[in-house]
């Protein structure tokens, strides 16, 4: 690399950074690719915004049935730019779902799910389910009237499943009724379990795209 700095040369000698950069920058991009092929990348950007703003809110949010609502109000009214952080979190959540839907439609309409990219499609659909789960679990965290009744209805849906329905309901709620255990479980899912799951499937998704390349035109 021409005119590289001594620091860059030191790292490049040990990590072969330039080889990685050359491999990424020389990847072939088919001529039929247009702006609609950026929808997946926009979805990723929305997720990163979600991660950053969500992490910021964990400094103030208190996952208890007594303090959850008041902690959200404190974030919105007393914390500097707290209202902006939460608003960006909500807006980017809606944008992420919208971009995800459009991305799925684009892949389906252009045949990007066909052989040999079936597993890429499967990981994408799995991430779509995880994204919806983010919405369900996050909706309940303010623990206001809307959040409480939403989690009560959602957690009661598995009761219709034969044999294991009641067990699934109790597993989600942490007991027979909606309460502190329910909020704790939804908070854990929203801030720990689902982000890690999404990160794992996202990594697999990108590695397969990297390996197989962008699908050709129909």
Swiss-Prot record:
CDD domains reported in the protein's UniProt record: Cytochrome_b_N
Record's subcellular location: Cellular thylakoid membrane
Record's cofactor remark: Binds 2 heme b groups non-covalently with two histidine residues as axial ligands.
Molecular function per GO: electron transporter, transferring electrons within cytochrome b6/f complex of photosystem II activity; metal ion binding; oxidoreductase activity
Keywords: Electron transport, Heme, Iron, Membrane, Metal-binding, Photosynthesis, Thylakoid, Transmembrane, Transmembrane helix, Transport
Protein residues bound to heme b 2: 89, 190
Cofactors: heme b; heme c
Binding sites annotated in the UniProt record for heme c: 38
Cross-referenced InterPro entries: Cyt_b/b6_N (IPR005797), Cyt_B6_PetB (IPR023530), Cytb/b6-like_sf (IPR027387), Cytochrome_b_N_euk/bac (IPR048259), Di-haem_cyt_TM (IPR016174)
GO CC annotations on file: plasma membrane-derived thylakoid membrane
Function according to Swiss-Prot or TrEMBL: Component of the cytochrome b6-f complex, which mediates electron transfer between photosystem II (PSII) and photosystem I (PSI), cyclic electron flow around PSI, and state transitions.
More info: Heme 1 (or BH or b566) is high-potential and absorbs at about 566 nm, and heme 2 (or BL or b562) is low-potential and absorbs at about 562 nm.
Protein name, as recorded: Cytochrome b6
Source organism: Synechococcus sp. (strain RCC307)
